[in-house]
Amino acid sequence: MADDDLSSLAPVAPAVWMFFLKKTRELADIVAAMSLCDKATPVVIAPLLIDLTVDRDFCGAVRTPMSTYEGGVLTKVTSFCPFAFFFHNTDEILDVVEDHGDVVHLCDDARRRFGVQAFSPLANRDRTDVDVLCDELGIAPAEYTGHVVCGNGLKELLYAGQLIPCPEEAVKVQVGAVDGVKVPLYPYTLFSGGADAAHADGPSAAVACDDPWVLEHGFYDPALSEALFYFMFTSWGQSLRVCETSRLIEAGLQQFVEDTQQTVKLTPFKKYHGYTSQKLTAVERDQLMTVDAVCSELAFSYASIYLDSVYEFSTASNFLEWPLVKNAKTHADLLDNLRDFQLHLAKHIAALIFSSNSILYQTRIVFVPSAGKGANSNPSAQDSLLKSIRFFNGLTGMYDDILNDAKKTIRFEGAVGRDEKYSPHHLAYFCGTSPQLFSTLMWFFNRMSIYSTGVTSGDTVFSHIVNAGSKLCGACGGRCCHTCYATSFIRVNTRLPGIPKQIKKEPVVVTLLSRAFADADLLGNYGKRYGLESREAGDGGGGGAGGRTDEVAAGPPAGGASGLNFVSVDRMKYLGQVLDYCKKNSLIDAITGEDIINVRTKRDFVATVTALNQTIDDAVCRFAMDVRRSGHGRDEISGSTQSFNLDLSPYATAFSPVLSFQYYRTMFSIIQNLALINAASYVVDNPLTTAQISKWVTLHFQSICGAFGTTPLKKGFLNVKDTKNLKSVEFERIMDFRSFQETGRYRKISTEIKSCKMSVQSLKSCRIKNRPISKTPQSSVFFKKGALQRKNPIKGCLSFLLFRCHEKLFPRCGLSCLEFWQRVLQNSLPRSVNVGKVEDFDNLVRFLLTVTDDYDESDVVDIQPDCLLSYVENRFHNKFLYMFGFRDYMSTIQGMSTRLTPQNHSQFPCLLKDAPKFASIAEYVLHFKKMKLDGVKAPQVATITREPVLKKLFDGRSLVSVSFAVEKYSSSMGTRDVFQFGQIGYYVGSGVDRSLNTGSMGTQDYRFMRYRYIIATKLVDVLIRRSRRENVMYDRDVVRSRVLAALDSTGLDVDPELAAIAELMEGRDEGDIPEIDDILFYVDQQEYIARSMYRKMRSLAERGVTDFSLASLREATATNATAAGSAAGGGGSATEGGGGGAAADESGPMYDFSALFSRRDEAEDVNAGLINGDDVRGDDEFELPSKRSRL
């Protein structure tokens, strides 16, 4: 229970710290590579990482003192914002930052154009002299950089300059390899007699402050406040559709200081954008405005509840523990690794920018009437309203006039216009007009691929760079045209999102970290046993500490109310039997799952694949019999659900400030989508009768807010954790705040500590689902399977094996694998091509045609396998579904992993070191050709490739970009409960990646409608270390499995014992021969084999063999065998005495023992219809796969 105690998870400590770190070139380079920077803006926004911006003793959640009472201090829980703001001595950081032009001027223009409120420094405040503070700390101001990290609840106080530094409590720290000092900052409320003392005169919390003591001692930096104003508060206002940022800050300050979560804060000054362009009736307008206000208020209140809570740092929060840092031998290597990681992130940035349904653009609320839905009763009216209101792309309606609280029309405050195309001003707006964020996105734009449309190509970039030499560039005046934002937009012009022409329902694209648990295989949760165990434990998926059971059991079971599909059948048992067969026969690696299949001849190929197919088909039949015995049918199978979980901790994506920026957008979107449920219910039950929206909201908000607290709990989508404080009162030695304010003297006293809340709620995860099989009687045309077309085997299910084994099957044939099989199918293969024995070749071709046609006949997955694991999974599920009458294609989740690929130098002007001065395109191209000849490394970009086994992406804790919509459905049990689930969706537009484009529609290939893509970057071995389970504790088990696989190998090209010895000796020191007892463990207690291997190893060691690789062992034993054969004339045994005996000549004729096995094959054919002793051939309910004799 101590692990769930709030007092242990969140110690009493300050929630704002100011760090001063010794300036070093290395630190400046690293911070510049990972932070949000603009060349002309002094504040740098860096990630919150241990050993980079904070020390190792830093805690991710604290109970911070907020106010005093007689004899004690009242604390409030808060977590930290996942970034650090560098504000002092940032010149060295900015010196190495790429220049992207006059971004500050662009952001100013965007504010004027779209009516965004601009920052104004506080009138009565002077900038705090940091040099004086450094002198008090005893450090030289010019030799240290300064940055501040802030708790979420105190960011408004930091903005307003109402935090008091306490140099007397400064602590020397070491952050990474850098020495420094950290200073706590306390809120002014501790020094003014507490919040209660000021209530007599009015609210105690306000941005404007006239207290002389606070004005003198409070820390205020206008540049830091400006960075907060745009990067955080303006962005939050866009998510909440609140345009007056200053009043949003005021409301946030009052909310945390005075605990006003259940009162109305935003609606009195809220303005309603994007309404006048919608064709709304008066009733629809009133409903939409009321729901808009309620959703904003609930999101603002519950963001404080969820963020001012307990969160622990993630596994990727320690910078020096990142594998990419540990693997760097030099500082230059580290910077290269960081740059490569940023390039991987570029693909996720592309998803967030180039998809027009990105979370960044979801800043508008719209009314989309449900066709054919009438309001016949209150529940139906609520459902109709719930389905009609959607959050939508804010690129539409940006110039609409505004409605105020009294529903009166106000003229738009910006520059009225009409946009036909996405521009830099739009991106600046959705960046909150933050120059640091916009400039960093330009760094990514400069390193993304150019997508040529055939009309515009790379020549456009060349022409722009050449013309930029005249210094006419409006973005930079010609000083940095190779990197400025104008060039960046020209490079990605064909990828930019379109401005929607009509309002419609769309999912939203987000980027979050995945959690380990996932039902990601083809049939998801169908036929898995864990559901029974979690339900017997009574965990329904709410807020327990068990990280696995709550995610497994979240929501009602798919596939029937009884949940029999979880209990009665075990699909994974039968699929696991096939995988065990593959491991035992050395088809796949026992640990990694990678293909290690080794075939030498055509007969070997046929025999291996035939045996594998037979194993799969047998397993399918046994599973089908198990399903029938359990009483399952098509309905239960149709209820299968694929799902995975995304981490909602603010620290999960703290390694990238860009992703932290969109994290807040995602959090607000999720809360507001859930808030629609309560808002729609109250609006239908209590129609608007007042002249002002704020009056209605004020009247009902307390009830709505209380009801919303239970709305997301155990409803299938959101997973929230409760943490309770087990101690009502504690005593700590802390600063005497009142004495310090009154006398200026610092002292610590034993103080009674109480918490404002005895329990807090924190966001844990959300669940995204996909139904592979449609439950509707008539499937869409996109899922209909047409007439079977016979495929060329090279484009069929075994193509990956044909490519891999081409050289062994057809040595020295002189044709590529693709050309060879195309000629075979066209019957145009010349006789000069050596195909080996014609009989064997004919058997191989007939076999491939038969297997390909058989696979295609039952194929409902429609994914071409590219490894044995995917082949096994696809064939197993195809056969199983075909037995139960499923003939239409299923919907599948496609995992796309990021990778880096080299590109043409000339497509990347950012490689130029100085402003370009080229007279012609030819000169430009020639310069880059010379650059290539001079050895300049080719630029790399992030591309995506399909992951054969989707589950691997989640096992490896990946960063995931995915599109989903929060769907709601009413309870069927007669209650008013509304359940939710995250339905996986699609990307809108063609700029995210060419692999996701929908260009196949004209060819009637509708796979793009059946595939649901997720873009993933594996973080294991990059930011996250492999668990000890994989690396240390089970190394012996890994070696053991590989030794046993080598002994079970049926390959004829190597002695199994030699292969086992090679596996056993790999990684051992020279001459370290294991003893018999050790070998017995590795060979599963097979004593004769252990002694034989031991004798061989000792004999080889005595002859001076030190290299125990397989090639070296074969050479050594071949030499020994030849010598022994000449001297002894064949006396002795190959196993006795370490490898003596006559050498076998495998190039000569072989014995034919096939007649010995003919009876066995016949027996297998006779028993083909029996499964566990039951004859199933006469059953009419499903079809069995045809059994083929082994060739």
From Swiss-Prot:
Region: Disordered, residue numbers: 1122-1146, 1168-1191
Signal sequence annotation: none
Subcellular location: Host nucleus
Region span, Required for nuclear localization: 1173-1191
GO molecular function, one term: single-stranded DNA binding
InterPro entries from the UniProt entry: DBP_sf, Viral_ssDBP_head, Viral_ssDNA-bd
GO cellular component: host cell nucleus
Keywords attached to this entry: DNA replication, DNA-binding, Host nucleus
One Pfam family in the UniProt entry: Viral_DNA_bp
Keyword Lipid biosynthesis applies: no
Residue numbers covered by motif Required for filament formation: 820-821
GO biological process, one term: DNA replication
Presence of the UniProt keyword DNA-binding in the record: yes
Composition bias type Gly residues, residue spans: 1127-1142
SUPFAM superfamilies: Viral ssDNA binding protein
Family label: Belongs to the herpesviridae major DNA-binding protein family.
Functional summary from the UniProt entry: Single-stranded DNA-binding protein required for DNA replication.
Quaternary structure (record): Homooligomers. Forms double-helical filaments necessary for the formation of replication compartments within the host nucleus. Interacts with the origin-binding protein. Interacts with the helicase primase complex; this interaction stimulates primer synthesis activity of the helicase-primase complex. Interacts with the DNA polymerase. Interacts with the alkaline exonuclease; this interaction increases its nuclease processivity.
Record-given protein name: Major DNA-binding protein
Organism: Murid herpesvirus 1 (strain Smith) (MuHV-1)
